[in-house]
Amino acid sequence: MKVYVIDYHKDDPKKCTGRKLVKLKLAELTRVGRGIILNPFSERTLSINDKDILIKSGITIIDTSWNNTSQNEFKNVRGEHRRLPILFAGNPIHYGIAYKLSSLEALMATLYILDEMKEAIKFSNVVKWGHTFIELNKELLEAYRNKDEEEIKKIEKEIIEKILRK
């Protein structure tokens, strides 16, 4: 399974998990999207139906800053764009905030949802807080794991409605 990173150099280099993956040779730096493109603005939600894409072509993470990102950074990247369902950041910068995942967290979530848990756990060892993300989202990740897009959207909708009722 290949992991690619498109780095827009908008993040603090010391906190950039995409660059860390490249530095550790766990990902390859690229300018071209390949396979699944993790895109928080995508209308399509990642699901088990995307596993063949992961196996054949890999996954591309677009590494940018949440503080100044826009759809334009994702729009021109070729590939199969997918967004992740609701999950909560376990990283120290955005801890507990829905959808604001680091590149590494997005990768771990993708692998977990696509039933590649051993790989997800392997990547969680890259940073001190990697296991925090998995533990914080364990119930959600298990609910999404191995599900098709419609099932995941239904689960996500129920979770959001539950949060809004509180």
Curated annotation (Swiss-Prot):
Primary enzyme class: transferase
Superkingdom in the source lineage: Archaea
Residues where S-adenosyl-L-methionine binds: T17, I62, L84, Y99, S103
Catalytic reactions of this protein: an N(1)-methylpseudouridine in rRNA + S-adenosyl-L-methionine = N(1)-methyl-N(3)-[(3S)-3-amino-3-carboxypropyl]pseudouridine in rRNA + S-methyl-5'-thioadenosine + H(+)
Molecular function via GO: 18S rRNA aminocarboxypropyltransferase activity; S-adenosyl-L-methionine binding
EC number: 2.5.1.157
An individual GO BP term: enzyme-directed rRNA pseudouridine synthesis
Gene Ontology CC, one term: cytoplasm
Subcellular location: Cytoplasm
UniProt keyword terms in alphabetical order: Cytoplasm, Ribosome biogenesis, rRNA processing, S-adenosyl-L-methionine, Transferase
Function, as annotated: Aminocarboxypropyltransferase that catalyzes the aminocarboxypropyl transfer on pseudouridine corresponding to position 914 in M.jannaschii 16S rRNA. It constitutes the last step in biosynthesis of the hypermodified N1-methyl-N3-(3-amino-3-carboxypropyl) pseudouridine (m1acp3-Psi).
Family statement: Belongs to the TDD superfamily. TSR3 family.
Protein name: 16S rRNA aminocarboxypropyltransferase
